[in-house]
Amino acid sequence: MKPSVILYKALPDDLLQRLQEHFTVHQVANLSPQTVEQNAAIFAEAEGLLGSNENVDAALLEKMPKLRATSTISVGYDNFDVDALTARKILLMHTPTVLTETVADTLMALVLSTARRVVEVAERVKAGEWTASIGPDWYGTDVHHKTLGIVGMGRIGMALAQRAHFGFNMPILYNARRHHKEAEERFNARYCDLDTLLQESDFVCLILPLTDETHHLFGAEQFAKMKSSAIFINAGRGPVVDENALIAALQKGEIHAAGLDVFEQEPLSVDSPLLSMANVVAVPHIGSATHETRYGMAACAVDNLIDALQGKVEKNCVNPHVAD
C-alpha cells in the first residue's frame, strides 16, 4: 500500500502524476483549521505534506501523528515550526538551489528600475506627460561603477555579485556571518561590518532569511547611516525590515529610493504609504516567479518528498540529523 501524502498546492499534471506513482495523494485547498477539521481522517493518516505559503505549526502537527516528512516549494521556511518538526523527527525539505539565478535577476531588475526610475517614468508617459524633450526632473542615476553593498552573501548574493561585478563594473561590499573567500577572489568583494557597508554603499541589497536574529535587523538606526543618495533593495524576507522605519526614512529623504519584493505583511495593504511614493518600486514577491523556475521548484519539491520518505536526505534537508 502506498504511503498517504497531502498536497496543498496545485502541481503541473506531469508532476502530480510523478507524485501519484509513489504515493496516494490527497489534495486540499489550504491548511486552515477548517480544512484540517473537515479532512481529519486524511490528515491523521498522512505521512507526507507538500505545498507552499501555509503555516505548519505545532497545532497542525498534533493532527498528523503519522507525518514523517514535509516538503515546501520554496527556499524559505520561516512559516514552519522547525523546532516542533525536529522534536517529532519530521524531515523538512526545501528548494534552495533552483531559484538562485532567477532571484538574482529580480534583484538586479530592482536595482535598475529604481535607479533609472523605469516604473515612474513609464507611468508618466502613459499619463500623457511626455510632451517635449525631457529635462532633469525625468533623470535617474547611474548604476555602473557605483558601490553595491550585499547583506547576506549566500547563493543568491553570489549570483547578484556576479552580475554587478562583470555586468556593471560595480565595487562590491558585503556583510555576512563569515568571510566568503570565493566572493573576494572572483568579484574582488570586500568584507566589512554592517555600519561601514551602510555608510559607503550606493545600493544596499538585503538578502537574508527571517530568523529571531534577523527580525527588524534594519530599522531607523540603519537607514540613518545610509547615504541620502542611496537606494535600498529588499528581496529576502519582509519582516527583516521595520517597514515603518523604512517609510519614515523615505519620507524624510534619509535614503533616495527603495525597490521592494517583500513586505512585513503580504499582500501589501492598498493603503500603505509605500504605494503613494514615486521613488518606491513595489512588486508582489516575484523573486522566483518565472514559469521555468516555478516549475523547477515544484519538481524539486516533489523529488524531495519522494527522497525523504525513502530515507534519502543527502540534499535539500533543513534538519537531516533527525534521520539518524
Swiss-Prot record:
Coiled coil region boundaries? none
| Gene3D superfamilies, per database record | NAD(P)-binding Rossmann-like Domain
GO molecular function annotations of the record: glyoxylate reductase (NADPH) activity; hydroxypyruvate reductase (NADH) activity; hydroxypyruvate reductase (NADPH) activity; NAD binding
Q: Which GO CC terms are listed, alphabetically? A: cytosol; plasma membrane
- Is Metal-binding one of the keywords UniProt gives this record? no
Instruction: Provide the top EC class.
Output: oxidoreductase
In short, the EC number is: 1.1.1.79, 1.1.1.81
Location of the protein in the cell: Cytoplasm
Question: What UniProt keywords apply to this chain's record, in alphabetical order?
Answer: Cytoplasm, NAD, NADP, Oxidoreductase
Catalytic activity field: glycolate + NADP(+) = glyoxylate + NADPH + H(+); (R)-glycerate + NAD(+) = 3-hydroxypyruvate + NADH + H(+); (R)-glycerate + NADP(+) = 3-hydroxypyruvate + NADPH + H(+)
NADP is among the record's keywords: yes
Query: Which PROSITE patterns would you find in this protein's record?
Result: D_2_HYDROXYACID_DH_2, D_2_HYDROXYACID_DH_3
**Which superkingdom?**
Bacteria
Catalytic residues per the record? 237, 266, 285
Function, in words: Catalyzes the NADPH-dependent reduction of glyoxylate and hydroxypyruvate into glycolate and glycerate, respectively.
Oligomer status and interactors? Homodimer.
Query: What family, per the record?
Result: Belongs to the D-isomer specific 2-hydroxyacid dehydrogenase family. GhrB subfamily.
Output this protein's name.
Glyoxylate/hydroxypyruvate reductase B
The protein's organism comes out as: Escherichia coli O1:K1 / APEC
User: Lineage of this protein's species?
Assistant: Bacteria, Pseudomonadati, Pseudomonadota, Gammaproteobacteria, Enterobacterales
